[in-house]
C-alpha cells in the first residue's frame, strides 16, 4: 500500500499455560464473546517483541455474543500491574463464538492501538482456533503464533 508505514509482524510467543488460560476464559464467557489483555516487553520503537509475560482475563462490558469491549476497570488494573512488572500492554484477545478466527469488520474499525497484537479465538468448531493479527489503518496482517511447553 503506497504511503503506508511498513511494519514487521512479530511472532506471538505464548506458554502452554497462557494459551490454556485464554481458551478456558473464552469457553467460560459463553454464550458471549470473552476478552482480555496481554502484557510483555516492547522494543525501543514501542513495538511488542511478541513475548507475552502476563495474560489478563477481562470482562466483556458489551455482554454480547457478537461484540466485545474490555471493561475499563480491567484495562486500568492490567495497565497498573504491567507497569509494576516493567512491561507494557501489547495486545488484546477475544473470542468469536459463531465465526472464524479472523478480525470482523467491527474488530478492524475498533482497533485503536496500532502497536498492539490482536488475538482472535474461534469457538465455532469442536476445537478452538487461536490466530493473531496486526491491525493498522484498516490493514490486517496475520502473525505467527508459537505455543511453548510450560
Region locations from a protein language model:
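Short, well-ordered beta-to-alpha junction loops that form the rim of enzyme active sites
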Residues: 95
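Conserved beta-strand-loop surface patch within small alpha/beta domains used
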Residues: 1-89, 98-150
Amino acid at each position: 500500500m503506497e504511503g503506508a508505514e511498513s511494519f514487521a509482524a512479530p511472532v506471538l510467543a505464548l506458554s502452554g499455560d497462557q494459551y490454556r488460560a485464554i481458551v478456558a476464559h473464552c469457553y467460560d464467557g459463553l454464550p458471549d464473546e470473552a476478552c482480555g489483555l496481554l502484557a510483555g516487553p516492547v522494543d525501543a520503537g514501542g513495538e511488542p517483541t511478541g513475548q507475552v509475560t502476563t495474560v489478563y482475563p477481562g470482562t466483556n462490558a458489551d455482554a454480547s455474543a457478537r461484540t466485545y469491549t474490555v471493561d475499563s476497570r480491567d484495562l486500568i488494573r492490567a495497565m497498573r500491574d504491567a507497569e509494576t512488572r516493567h512491561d507494557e500492554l501489547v495486545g488484546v484477545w477475544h473470542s468469536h463464538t459463531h465465526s472464524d478466527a479472523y478480525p470482523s469488520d467491527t474488530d478492524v474499525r475498533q482497533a485503536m492501538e496500532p502497536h498492539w497484537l490482536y488475538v482472535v479465538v474461534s469457538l465455532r468448531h469442536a476445537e478452538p482456533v487461536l490466530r493473531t493479527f496486526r491491525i493498522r489503518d484498516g490493514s490486517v496482517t496475520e502473525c505467527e503464533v508459537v505455543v511453548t511447553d510450560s
